Every structure is written in C-alpha cells, then in structure tokens.
Amino acid sequence: MKMPSASSIRWMWLGILILLVAAFARLYLFGDAPPGLQHDEIFKAQEGRALIEQGDFRLFYPSNQGHEGLYVWLLGVSYTMFGTSVMMIKFPAFVVGLLTIAVAYRVIGQTVNRRVGAIAAALIAISFWAVFVNRVGLRANTLPLFALFVVGGLWWMTRIHIQSRQQWIIAVATGAALGLSIYTYTSAFALFVAVGLFVVALMLFQRTTLRQHWRELLIVGLLGMVIAVPMVWIRLSDPQGVNRVSTINRPLTSALNGDSTELVDNFWNLAGMPYFTGDPEWRYNVAERPLFTTPVGLLFYAGFGVALWRVRRQPIVILFLAFATVGLIPSLLTVAAPSFLRSILALPAVMLFVALALDVIRDKRIVTGLGVVVIVITAVTDWQAYFDTWLQNDEVHAIYRDDLEAVASFAREEDSPRLLVSTTDTELDPLLFEYLQPPDDASISFFDGRTTIALSDQPALLMISPLSAITPPHADWLTSALGTTQLPSLLRKDGALAYEVYQLDAVAALASRLAQMQTRPVYIYNETNYPRGRVDEWAEATEYPVNFGNIVELVGVDLPRTEIATEQDGVNIQLYLHPLIERQDLPLNVFVHMSQLDGTVHAQRDLLGVPALQWTSDMMFIQDNFVVAGPTPPGRYIITMGIYNFQNGERLPILDASGNVIADHLVIDRVRAVAP
C-alpha cells in the first residue's frame, strides 16, 4: 500500500485546520448569534417534526409560500437526535456548512490547484456570507454543497484516469447530486444550466474529452432530469409551486410591462455585490454592506477575468462562471437585490475567483503570503461586522427573537406561571416559543398588544413587548389604579428592553368596568335595510353576555363617541370578549361594520387580537376595533359586529339562553357623520 507523501499530509492537516477554524466561527456564541430564532426557521422545523411524528414526507412543502423538501428531511433526522430544541434547528446547517468547506477544499484543489483550493475554502470558512448562512436553519445552506458535488463528479469523470466501472459509478453519483439539487433551493435551476454550459465548452475546446466521455455525461444529464421531474411537475402544476416567487418578482413583472428600471438597478447592484453594494436587509446582512469591505472585493473582478481566460484550457471553470452569473438570476428578477440568500449558489465561485486573482502571480510564495493576508483581513472585518455591528442592531433583534427566549427563561424560573405575552405575530411566535423549551406547567397566551390587551380573572403576569406595545385605549390597565404592579423588566441578550412585566390583579377592576360597559345595550335586527330613528326604536335589545356559537361571548362594548367627522376620522369601539373554549385551532375573526341605512358597508375593521389557539377560560380580552371611516358623506351609519370563520366566511350564530339561533350579528348603535 502506497504511503501518502509528506506534501499530502501537510495539505491534509491544513484542511483540518481550516475546518477547525470554520467550526469555531460557527459555534462561537452558539445560540446567541443570531440572537434568537426567526419565523422561516420555525416553518422548516415544524415540518421536520411532522415528518418523524406523522410520516409527512413530501417533495415540496406548501407552507410559508412553498419550498423544497430536502432540508426538511435533514431536520427530521435532527429532530430524532435533539428533539424540539434550538439545536435541532441549527445542527443540519452546521454540518452542511462544514461539508461544503471540506468539499470545496478538495474539489477546487483538484480542478485548479491546492493553493487556490485552500484560499477559497478558508474564505468560505471565515467570510460573513458563509458564516451567517451556516448559523441559520434555512434550506439555502444545502445548494452550494450539491453544486460542488456536481463539479467534483464532472471533473473526476472526465479528467482523472480511473477504471471504467468507477467512471460509471461517478456518473451515477453526479447525476443523482444534480437531480437532488432541485430539492434544495429555488436557485438550483442554474446548476442544470451550468452543466449544459460545461458540455458546450467541451464541444468548443476539448472535443476529444467529449468523445471519450459522452456516455457518462449523458447518464449525468438523464439521471439528473429524471430525478428532477417530480419537482418540475410540482412547480408547473401546483399553484403553491410558484407562489413564493410570485410574491417577490416585481422587477420581472415591471420589465414585462415595459418598465425595466428596477431590473437594471438590480443588475448593477448584483454586479457590485463583491465590493460596491450589499444586501439591503438586516435579516441576512449588515444592511448595504458588500461581501468584502476592503480592496479584497476588487480581486473578485480580476479573478472572474482569469476564469474566463482559463475556460479554453479548463472547461470545468465554466461551471463556476455560471454559478456567479446564472446563479444570480433569482436575485436579479426579485426585490431587494442583491439578496445574499437568493444568490447563494455564487458563494463558492466568489471565493474561488478571489483566490484565482492571487494565483496569477508567478512567485507562489507571494501568492501564499497574500492569501494569508486576504484571509486575515476578511476574518477580522467580517468578524466585527457579524458579532458586533449586526448582532447589536435593533432590527436584527426584532427578526431573531431573543426577547421570547427571555420569556422562556423567566417562565422556567417561576412556579406554574400564568403569562399573558404581547407579540407582533400571534400565529408564528407561539410556535417559535415552543422551541425555546418553556416549562410544561406554564400557562402562556400570546396576544397582539398593538390592538388588544389580555386580562385574567386569576393572578397573572402581563408581559409587554416594545415591538407590540399597549395602545392608549388600554394603557390604564397598566396602572396601579386598576390593581396592576410593575415588576423588573426582562432584557435582551444585548441589555436592551425585551419585555416590561406587570403583576395583574384585575378582578375587581374588571368587574367594575364590565358593569359600566353593560349599561349600554346591544341589539338584534335581522333585516338587511336599517330604519331611521334611534336603534332602540326598531331593534330588539339583548342581554350580556352575548353567546357566539358556544365558542366565545361578548361581555361588553365601549363606544365613546357616536358623532364622527366626515374626514380623517373613524369609529372608536372597544369589544370585551370572553372565550368559552380553550386552545382550539379555529380560523376565527371579528368584524365591525360601519354600514349605510341600505345595508351597504361603508367601512369595516376585521381583527382578532388573541387567536383561538391562545384562549383559556380565565381570560378576557379587550380589542380596539377602530374603524377608519375614510371620506364619509354626512349622515347616519349603523355599527354592527359579528364573528366568522375566515376560511369559509360562515358567521358564528348568536344563541339565546335556550341555545336557539337568534342572529348572526349584533347591532351596536348608530353614529352620525358631521362635516367640520
């Protein structure tokens, strides 16, 4: 058995060193950078759980506007290892990131040379772009790895002298990697284009190689297309298949309609991505920061030119050129370019081109020295950008929710706590919160503080986020006059405010308030046209509480003004609601209509500040259904309200004490619009 040479051993240890540095960059402040989880990660994690718990295996998952399935499969494996946890979400991205670096080191080292492979792999190991992506649990992580598998397979199949049987094995493996790539991320179509361009380059520059290996190349193409067919079919036949793209493709649709301004702007933004422009969103970048903030970025353009020059001699390089051009099309055609996430296929090519620019220098010792300088400069600037500038930005904390982690930590320290938590997203934040492992004995309900306040007839803690602060109509519930005591606040990981905490003792104040509210009657009237005159003259008063389908009851209404202006005004109405069921996933909403006397709706407000999945029997919530009237002709208008299923439009019936249906909406009162 032939022993490896000393040179090979040195390169092996260098590769190990690069991987160790990469692992450190991805594990340092693990769980704290990003500061918390974001909603896109939760969608994938939920599907990974469902894959294991319910056997819900899919090629394409329709949730969150639709996405490919391969990363969900990896999350399923992670769930079997770590359960419902942050580690479950982060682990696949970490492993895929290290594999990408290892494969880049090997593949680029063989297709170009070891020195270039080492520089490129090291840049992937420490660059902001790669480190960032590998620290979030999103499917884009997987595409560069599969792209490098395909590059390596095509190289070994057409350039390395191996036995025929091994060539066929490599061809099958490469075709499988090509086909499976379509299940990683939307940008994967560019990998198929790149393989086609590689074949064209062989036709133009190395026909002998093409004649020798056309059968293996045919296998790669055919197998890749066969494996990809189900996903292509889903994309073309399922409305969800293109839903994600259709929500962000304004530059394309505008160009098709004759206005190419945004498309041209996107082109220049993408062209300047290495040095001049950057992703404008804090979600995935220090907003507007280019990939490289030093002259290192200029090396990309030189390296791109070197790659073009080398295509005739090394057609395999055209794959990387395609990654850096065709791979940018998803960002070119969509909003917020340059999007670092949608451009992810270009990542290995960008790092390769920086290394290629250095490698043209004849003295390879200088190349090595400059490579080290480039790596160190990139590491220092990108480390500061990620772990300092980006991590301390308020917008980042609003996306990556470490404030919810503070709530979970607080709940673990309390004895069977009852928490009422304000949040901006009452659907997704509870799912995210579950992965932060709150205690099983905690009773926690989320509500939208921007429209609603949740109260309890039992001792409870009210937690108010600055992102979802209580509005003036409900602010008195935070005062000592209504029995509320402010406690020490919860802080984010950077020391900023996460949640204000209040001890509620609202039983007496709530009873007094309801007694006051219930002096205003509400009415039943089932005709479509409304008579003139006072409501109590033509509608039948009904008693509180008003039972909506044995699901929820209206226990009070506050309508402080019955006269509004015809301009820049609206109907200020507060609804007091009490659930009759607990934590059921019902698609409910509450409407308030401002109608003309002929029944035509002039304006309306639909909202439910506490989803039914968050309801408990001890809870009562008050929501501000302020109806923005807009320009309003002078006259009388009727205010009505009801509750409906927003999926099928059916209204909940109003039941009398015997359970009989008496209406499907309430008349609250009439208001008068008066010209200034």
Q: Regions from the language model: what does each represent?
A:
Residues T562-Q568:
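Short, solvent-exposed loop/linker segments at the N-terminal edge
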Residues P631-I639:
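Short glycine/proline/serine/threonine-rich loop/turn segments at secondary-structure transition edges
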